[in-house]
Amino acid sequence: MNEERRQLEHTVKTRVRYGETDQMGVVYHANYLSFFEIARTELIRLRGVVYSALEEDGLRLMVTEAGLEYHSPGRYDDVLAITARLAGSGPARVRFDYEVRREGEDEVLVTGH
């Protein structure tokens, strides 16, 4: 992977907690949006930007669209690797894409934007 692309993506890991699952031990679908936010925030932080500093300057980063595609379930106690990737930007818009995998596995569980 080239250096420029590496700077435009970041992967964080989190262990699925019991409260993030449904009665069957599967990650509740809406929790992936929280996982995406964690990865996105850390990617931005690595680029030297902190949300609170943006807010102090009167800027807000609002989510105006979110989409997820479920390929395979995450389960209680899985360690998930969530990758956020800067997919595009414009004068008033930034787009991030996401992939979720179990740590150490190639299978993509969830993709999103």
Regions found by a protein language model. Give the residues of each.
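Hot-dog-fold acyl-thioester-processing enzymes
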Residues: 2-64
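HotDog/MaoC-like acyl-thioester-processing domains
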Residues: 2-12, 45, 70, 75-79, ...
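Short alpha-helix capping/helix-loop boundary micro-motifs
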Residues: 65-69
